From Swiss-Prot:
InterPro entries: Aldolase_TIM, NanE, RibuloseP-bd_barrel. Its EC number is 5.1.3.9. This is Putative N-acetylmannosamine-6-phosphate 2-epimerase. It comes from Staphylococcus carnosus (strain TM300). Pfam families: NanE. It catalyses: an N-acyl-D-glucosamine 6-phosphate = an N-acyl-D-mannosamine 6-phosphate. It comes from the Bacteria. Belongs to the NanE family.
Amino acid sequence: MLPQGLIVSCQALPDEPLHSSFIMSKLALAAYEGGAVGIRANTKEDIEAIKTEVPLPVIGIVKRDYEGSDVFITATSKEVDELIESGCEVIALDATKQKRPKETLEELVTYIRKHAPNVEIMADISTVEEAVNADKLGFDYVGTTLRGYTSYTKGHILFEDDFAFLKEVLDKVNAKVIAEGNVITPEMYQTVSNLGVYCTVVGGAITRPKQITERFVQAAKDQS
């Protein structure tokens, strides 16, 4: 089981400046030394590198595009197998209603329970309906990761309307709720913690210096 507290997402895609398993492992080490209780990471290679640096549980994903599907976070059993081999403690996967490239969501949950009974499962959702469905399928954690990132939630953001979406998810599911997506300040982190989430994943605001720089530059432009 994940400990309660701050989970830091350490990810960089191939087109990003920090793309490197070595760099991700050092970001994870910095997060650990700063007090993070867990790491979220992408790819078997990154997870294995991170596990040589920190004694923290890892939420593992594999991002891979499939033609004809918008699902790209741990989309099929192929990615699940890679994550099982990585030794991550939690496997996260897209649990939205979007068209899947291969197995159904229920089939993937069954597959993980059969082949890795000691590994927990996290649902990345974008709507309350998806959260409720994931809860019914027996996910251990429900995360708000994809709010605003599906075609039917585009334009929405986790902190709008005083975190109304997060509050509704907390009210509707029995699984442990993880706040993730656009938690970009310590104040927001404190707010979602006070709402009763089990833990919170923060990524770009900590581990993506390009994104952080852009935020500062934009703030200066807005003032001019």
